[in-house]
Amino acid sequence: MDGLPPWERNIGMVFQNYALWPHMTVRGNVTYGLRLRKLARREIVARLEAGLRKVNLVGFEDRYPGQLSGGQQQRVALARVLVLNPDILLLDEPLSNLDAKVRVQVRAEIRRLQKDLGITTVYVTHDQEEALSLSDRVAVMREGRILQLAPPKELYERPANRFVADFVGTNNFLTGVCRGVEGDALVVETPLGVVRARRREDLAAGTPCVLAVRPENIALGRADGNTFTGRVVLASYLGNTLRYDVDVAGTLVKLDVRDPWHHELLPPGQEMALTFPPSAALAFPEE
């Protein structure tokens, strides 16, 4: 690919703002690139029909972009690229202008198309849910550098550093000092007290570090592991989740309860115990 001039690289591009010709119908927009390539009329018609089937827009051939919803316009932009049979597909935040429900629907369609067609796809997004749900591998970048390239599950559960842990999902961060290793746990002194974290061999005693604990990995009550007591500062009902902000020894800790139908929403000021296992606390060197 590096040895080819840009106009000879068979790359398809889908833009954030759709980039449709407003004076052209769906048919005109989708076949624009095919006509530039001077394909035979029969081939153009066949590719148009196949492309519209792939994006569920059969019957919309004679409509103009202004007569389509945002989701339908983005499907037209996808079809325009797919009819060119690209070797690589580039998508630059293609769903950012869509409403939440439509975004989820089109996201699922893009994933289905990518799997069905087997096209190598580079998808740029700031939406973490999009990145995790669409990708086979996710690259987290900062200032032009890739900090971690990994499958979504690995990226979420085993981030390479604090930046990745903070960028992907929600985390509680606790600053502390390593005190050494005990069994399978790394012992860290934090403002909450002593916390046992997932074991790391490269953090020596006395090393400043940061612990990351995801809200969904913290449970109500007392159990073996790390248990602390605090007071509810804010309680939020989010439908399938109860989100608590808890003051623990002057540190605000976020806690998610995933089965709210089994729990009453505790009011601000209520004392509560919270616990998490050592495996839920990831340690990183202080940056």
Protein language model features and the residues they cover:
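Glycine-centered flexibility sites
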Residues: G12, G33, G59, G70-G71, ...
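A structure-centric signal for secondary-structure junctions around beta-strands
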Residues: E8, D92, G118, T170, ...
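Non-catalytic connector elements of ABC transporters
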Residues: N171, V181-E287
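ABC ATPase nucleotide-binding domains
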Residues: P6-G12, Q16, L20-F163
